[in-house]
Each structure stands twice: as C-alpha cells, then as structure tokens.
C-alpha cells in the first residue's frame, strides 16, 4: 500500500471520531497474519473505509466496477486497496485476483450481498464468497455492521449516529472439494450469512434471524 492509503485511514478515523459514535467490538478475534477472507453486511457506501479502519491489519477489497469509472474515484478506491468486480455475472478475473490475494497470505474484504441493503435488513448472499473460500481454504472472519445506514441525508452529522463494527471469530467452511456444485455453494453461502447475522442486532438479521446456529468449524 502507498502513502495515500495510510493518510486516507487517518482521515477516515478522524471523521468517524468527530461526527459519529464509532465502536469496534471483537478486535482480538482478528488473526494478525496469514490469509483471511473477511465478510460483512453492506448498508452504506462508507462501509469499506469503516471496515478498513476497524481492522488491525491491511486488507484488500472487492468493489463494484461502476465505482472505478471516474479518474478520481478510480485512484482513490485503488489507493485504498480495492479492485473491481462486475456484478450480475461470474467475473472470473476478479475471482482469480481475489484468490491470488489470499494465496499471498493477505486479507480480503467482501460484501456477500453484493449491494447495499435498501432497508438495513441482511439480504441473501451471492455465492462468490463461498466459491473463493472453497478454492483458497482461507479462514473466514465475519463482521456485522450497524449504524452506517443512518449516514444519509444532509443532516446526519448533527445526529452523530452510533456505528458498531462487531467482529466475530474466524471459522472454516465444511470441506466439499474444489468442484462444489450449485446446491453446495448455496448452502455454504447461507452458512456465511448466518455467521454475519449472529453479529447483528435482531432487527437487522432479515430472514437469517429465523435460522439456527451455524455448524461451521471455528478456528
């Protein structure tokens, strides 16, 4: 990461401390080294930088391709450790890049819902995160974000919203082999989303509030 990354982190932290009530829980659960697939729910465009400054290690991000179209946003987002992914189809190049990040022992952040939740409820996850986890065998670190959905409109700063980043324990998916079929990937994706749901307030869990405890293997 270049100098801009570290300056941007300082700026984001300053903003969060100044205009929000930002709290990070479970920071001790973050492995300090080795490959790590970080998955979180998605409420606001601010979620990637909020997650980044909540971690105690450098992480790369997958971000929608549309954010890279202007020169300024392309420079800013890439400087913050992001690379593009095309939504709505299987982006093999992005998947390969994600696997390379993990194979090099780095951390990668994904938002399995693929887009921001329109009502703060946890939406169904897409299978990309499960596919990457299966191919890389990387441990998964779930994160539940609440409060960033209030960072909207011209006057949200005056409310100083309470933002909580709740970090769970890393876990491994059950072994299914590299050629997991669609049914297996759907089940693994559901496991990932359940881990995220358990870190959210009940009113944010959506359909996953009705599901039982996860049976993945905790590290």
Per-region residue spans from a language model:
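A generic secondary-structure micro-motif detector
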Residues: 1, 62-63, 87-88, 118-119, ...
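Non-catalytic C-terminal accessory region of glycerolipid acyltransferases
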Residues: 4-7, 93-219
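Catalytic core of membrane glycerolipid acyltransferases/transacylases, capturing the structured
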Residues: 5-10, 17-18, 31-89, 97
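Short gly/ser/thr-rich secondary-structure transition/capping motifs
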Residues: 17-25, 89, 146-149
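Generic structural signal for residues in well-ordered beta-strands
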Residues: 22-24, 82, 165
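Membrane-interface helix-loop junction between the first two transmembrane segments
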Residues: 23-33
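Residues at the C-termini of beta-strands that transition into short coil/loop
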Residues: 28, 65, 86, 144, ...
